[in-house]
């Protein structure tokens, strides 16, 4: 019994000594916790295009990617980049107006629809046909947004929205008389087989149900045009600049932040509590239900559902810069590369 007791006491002394030795050991001998890894976010090789190498104007309103072709709407014409060369379409080619504000692709035929400051144009196999208030049912010649779904072309104009049935050629007009909008300045449109959404300046977001023909409106529920009383109570602001509907998720950009809506709950994004470089957002493009791109006046932002990446030009030399913001709010610069313009 004495031997067993002595053995237990001796083992206890060794254990205490081991703990004391570990506590007194140099810090260099103790494994340090690894720093959290930087989230994997899209990294790009940037190549810039200006009037010096083919663009008709440096003021770009819209970009459309069609396979290996890139269409660019500028303040002075429509540009097509294909096979490392630019081709420019102007009013001399039949374009409705030199300022091209929006672009959409009709995938079945490959036709490109261009919304301009002077009407709506269709580019088909090199031929351009234009629609205006004078020769069609277009509600206004200032076309801010266009979206093609099925056999319908949906258009957002400065005087409401309209739809062109490509099969019958019939136009339908939508404004304050037959929809819930009380402002008719439609900035953007996103059409799918089930729902069509319009971004309306001062009237929030309009939703059209393709099956029932019902219209609904989403706006800032607290009625404050500048202050969001409760962050996720609804659409962040009534001045909506664009909408993107994908995977049953609505993304909406405004000049005061951005919103995501899943049909039941809203989630809003502000510069102060997200990775947005600015609340002033001109365009949002949803990748899917979790990911989206945001075009702001302070840079391009990408959200993967948790983390953020921001792409901006350097103030020193104009070269691209990238930062990543993780879920904990830590911001880390990331190296990116560029190609000569």
Predicted segments with their positions:
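Carboxylate-rich, polar loop motifs that coordinate divalent cations or form catalytic acidic clusters
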Residues: 3-7, 12, 23-341
